[in-house]
């Protein structure tokens, strides 16, 4: 029981901590952490509470709207691709999170007058989201395998 509560608290802290990392007015850990959270089996309201408190305190309102849209796209993408297929969830999660971030950023960029710097920043943020989502997902698979006393390398490859 205590380990389950500890996992819920860690997910809430990860959600809150993802709002603290800001790189050039972008928050690449929010989509990455949410994508990994969608793959986990222990869904909890504490994650959303940590995310909303962190976003409300540290992020501007237009950025909150942007990342809430990205989170919605990640949720539906996860439901479509990962749950219906037997493919590797890490790669799919990373691709869905990166594509959602890129589409949202590029659509906002092309609504105005597109600048080369904004396009490069949009692509760079989606690449950072891809790499962070993949790294966090592999780390969670590794920890889950260690918890069940399996070989973490083989457990991560199988599924």
Regions picked out by a protein language model, each given a short descriptive name:
Residues 33-43, 71-82, 130:
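Alpha-helical transmembrane segments and their membrane-interface exit regions
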Residues 20-32, 46-71:
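Subset of alpha-helical transmembrane segments and adjacent helix-loop junctions
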Residues 1-45:
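Hydrophobic transmembrane alpha-helices
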Residues 8-12, 22-27, 60-68, 79-159:
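Membrane-embedded alpha-helical hairpins and interfacial helices in multi-pass inner-membrane proteins
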């Amino acid at each position: 029981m205590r380990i389950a509560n500890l996992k819920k608290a860690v997910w809430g802290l990860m959600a809150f901590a993802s709002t603290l990392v800001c790189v050039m007015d972008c928050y690449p850990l929010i989509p990455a952490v949410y994508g990994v959270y969608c793959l986990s089996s222990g869904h909890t309201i504490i994650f959303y509470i940590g995310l909303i408190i962190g976003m409300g305190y540290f992020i501007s309102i237009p950025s909150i709207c942007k990342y809430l849209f990205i989170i919605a796209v990640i949720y539906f993408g996860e439901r479509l691709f990962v749950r219906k297929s037997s493919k590797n969830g890490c790669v799919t999660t990373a691709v869905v999170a990166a594509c959602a971030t890129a589409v949202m950023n590029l659509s906002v960029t092309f609504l105005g007058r597109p600048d080369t710097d904004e396009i490069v920043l949009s692509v760079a943020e989606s690449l950072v989201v891809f790499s962070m989502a993949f790294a966090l997902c592999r780390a969670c698979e590794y920890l889950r395998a260690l918890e069940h006393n399996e070989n973490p390398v083989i457990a991560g490859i199988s599924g």
